[in-house]
């Protein structure tokens, strides 16, 4: 059975931040790409700002109520109740070759004033379309075996582990491992 090469894997990121508004974040990234930031009225809840990159992919900056907003006053971050400072960036579907683009977007946001605090987090969505049931079983087993090391290295706040970034549960892992080898992706 062929393995999945990391370089063939599609992914997307959600990165939470504060220190700047959704509009400021979108305008900074639009400047990087030489395009425009657009205030989309598609959702009153998430109040999205959108930027299209040079490949026609859309980067979104949306409201996230879990973020504790702040803004810079001099050299200090000061808490602020203004929801505009609660920013979650949603990347488009990216290829491995676009990792540099993602890094440049993050650097651009940092230079524009983006910061993180204990309420901010990130996660990565991994495209499963090229996976097989066996490769997903393998990925889950690897993640389970390395979770504690990753969480410690990343200094993940325990309250976030409880609520937002829960670890793989052993009963679920065992259930997946016991699936027959002829299990289809639809069955998974």
Question: PLM ranges: what are they?
Answer:
Residues 1-188:
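Phosphate/nucleotide-binding catalytic core
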């Amino acid at each position: 059975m062929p393995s999945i090469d990391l370089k063939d894997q599609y992914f997307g990121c959600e990165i939470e931040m504060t220190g700047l508004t959704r509009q400021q974040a979108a305008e900074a990234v639009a400047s990087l790409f030489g395009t425009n930031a657009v205030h989309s009225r598609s959702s009153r809840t998430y109040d999205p700002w959108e930027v299209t990159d040079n490949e026609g992919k859309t980067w979104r900056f949306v409201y996230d109520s879990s973020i504790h907003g702040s803004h810079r006053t001099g050299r200090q971050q000061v808490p602020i109740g203004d929801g505009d400072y609660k920013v979650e960036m949603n990347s488009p579907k990216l290829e491995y070759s676009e990792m540099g683009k993602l890094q440049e977007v993050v650097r651009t946001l940092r230079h524009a004033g983006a910061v993180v605090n204990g309420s901010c987090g990130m996660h990565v969505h991994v495209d499963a379309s090229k996976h097989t049931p066996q490769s997903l079983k393998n990925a889950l087993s690897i993640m389970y075996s390395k979770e504690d090391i990753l969480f410690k290295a990343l200094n993940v706040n325990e309250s976030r582990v409880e609520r937002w970034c829960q670890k793989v549960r052993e009963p679920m892992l065992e259930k997946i491992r016991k699936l027959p080898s002829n299990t289809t992706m639809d069955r998974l």
